[in-house]
Regions:
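GST-like domain detector, emphasizing the conserved glutathione-binding G-site
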Residues: 1-131, 135
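Short, solvent-exposed turn/loop segments enriched in Gly/Ser/Thr/Pro and often Arg
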Residues: 32, 169, 214
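Phosphate-coordinating loops and pocket residues in cytosolic domains that bind phosphorylated ligands
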Residues: 45, 203, 212-213
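Residue-level recognition of oxygen-bearing side chains
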Residues: 67, 193, 206
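Short, hydrophobic secondary-structure boundary micro-motifs
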Residues: 79-84, 106-108, 161-165, 190, ...
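GST-like fold's C-terminal all-alpha helical module
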Residues: 100-203
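Acidic/histidine-enriched, glycine/proline-rich intrinsically disordered or flexible terminal extensions
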Residues: 132, 214-222
Length: 222
């Protein structure tokens, strides 16, 4: 049976959702974040980097969200959740699957980290740290996030999903960046196509089952 090492309020929710869409049996080991919001050190007993999601299947360890999504669809998908190779939909699928972690998440992580920097320095240095953090956010991070959100809205306006009219692994991969952006980026909740995309995926029975089986996931409330 597949085992999922699930860090609460993390990208691991996507893996549970995918497993539910595929109708696979699995068990979940939930890890709670520490007071510093980091993963517990016990995750390093599973994988050297101590990150989540990580799955175990057939005695092997698989890490990285995109790699796990590809592995599960390749191994158990039976043609589901992935367009036919050689089609335009397949090219879009590959693009968005890699874009989720390669382009979207680095910006969102930087947004989060720079918002926390002032709280991590000595009190007397906080005014300077705040100025630097806000400067980086306003000059670099926020403009790029604005462009990316506009890109999502444009693509989703075509047919409601990222790769066409049917749900794919790329839509599952993109769910976390979009949900995280709802709580970190101003104006995202006013984008109608993005809002419809979230309403659509959250209404899926598999998504709801994943919420019940996993740990805390605050992003489902955005």
């Amino acid at each position: 049976m597949i085992s999922v090492h699930y860090l609460d309020n993390s990208r691991a929710h996507r893996i549970l959702w995918l497993l539910e869409e595929l109708g696979l049996e699995y068990d979940v080991k939930v890890y709670a974040r520490g007071s510093d919001m980091r993963a517990p050190k016990t995750l390093k007993d599973v994988h050297p980097l101590g990150k989540s999601p990580v799955i175990e299947d057939g005695g092997k360890i698989y890490a990285e969200s995109g790699a796990i999504i590809e592995y599960l669809i390749d191994t158990y998908g039976k043609g589901a959740l992935r367009p036919k190779q050689g089609t335009d939909a397949y090219r879009r699928y590959v693009y968005w699957l890699h874009y989720a972690e390669g382009s979207a998440m680095p910006l969102l992580v930087m947004k989060l980290l720079f918002s926390r920097i002032p709280r991590q320095v000595p009190f007397l240095l906080r005014p300077v740290a705040t100025l630097i953090s806000k400067g980086v956010a306003s000059k670099f991070i926020n403009p790029q996030l604005k462009d990316n959100v506009a890109f999502w809205e444009s693509e989703l306006s075509k047919d409601g999903l990222f790769t066409g009219g049917e749900l794919t692994g790329a839509d599952i991969a993109m769910s976390f960046p979009v949900e995280a952006a709802m709580s970190r980026v101003d104006g995202v909740d006013a984008q109608p196509a993005i809002r419809l995309y979230l309403d659509t995926i959250r209404a899926r029975p598999a998504y709801q089952r994943a919420l019940k089986k996993g740990g805390a996931y605050v992003y489902a409330k955005s």
